[in-house]
Amino acid sequence: MLPSQEASKLYHEHYMRNSRAIGVLWAIFTICFAIINVVVFIQPYWVGDSVSTPKPGYFGLFHYCVGSGLAGRELTCRGSFTDFSTIPSSAFKAAAFFVLLSMVLILGCITCFALFFFCNTATVYKICAWMQLLAALCLVLGCMIFPDGWDAETIRDMCGAKTGKYSLGDCSVRWAYILAIIGILNALILSFLAFVLGNRQTDLLQEELKQENKDFVGTTVSSVLRPGGDVSGWGVLPCPVAHTQGP
């Protein structure tokens, strides 16, 4: 084997080990993002009360709990995604839809992991990358649309008269909203990494095909040529000598 071929083989083995390790980490963080997506969709802790709010309570995408404002901290909870009429704002409905779509996309991406056993690795990486990018986009839309519903009467009763669109008044942002923003960054990084892994797999496949073609040509030529340089099957033909007869 030529030195260049040995170097190429070593590079290929080294890259395959590293790509498998990176791919495993990518899959683990994809599952983590899916968990984040499910949590931020279900949990009602997107915005909540503070020490100066007229009433205690907290709001999510579709589920919310608000107190009466009297002594005690008893909360009345309402809202269900299956019953849109219980959601206090159309902006909340739209935000819930986009976050749900993001959750469906990332769960579909995890389902596509099974394709690694049947399809080309580069193709699967690129499919997952697009799904993660779309999931991030849907989550961005959900986070941007959600504050548009802060002027709903139910939220104004809890957060005070200063509350309006994109203004929480006396209320504050809770951990689920922050977790959704972290999830967006996570999804964008995962999508970029999947595109890189997919493109590298494509380049590696092309290099392997080129190397196989070179090896095939070299093997064919070496099998045709003899060690001494003669072409196999072509013997040295005797030179015909003209015999002249005497007078």
From Swiss-Prot:
Keywords: Cell membrane, Cell projection, Membrane, Neurogenesis, Postsynaptic cell membrane, Synapse, Transmembrane, Transmembrane helix. The keyword Transmembrane applies. One of its GO terms (biological process) is nervous system development. It is a multi-pass membrane protein. One of its GO terms (cellular component) is dendrite. Plays a role in the regulation of inhibitory synapse formation and function by being involved in maintening gamma-aminobutyric acid receptors (GABAARs) clustering and their associated scaffold proteins at inhibitory synaptic sites. Acts in concert with NLGN2 to recruit or stabilize GABAARs. This is LHFPL tetraspan subfamily member 4 protein.
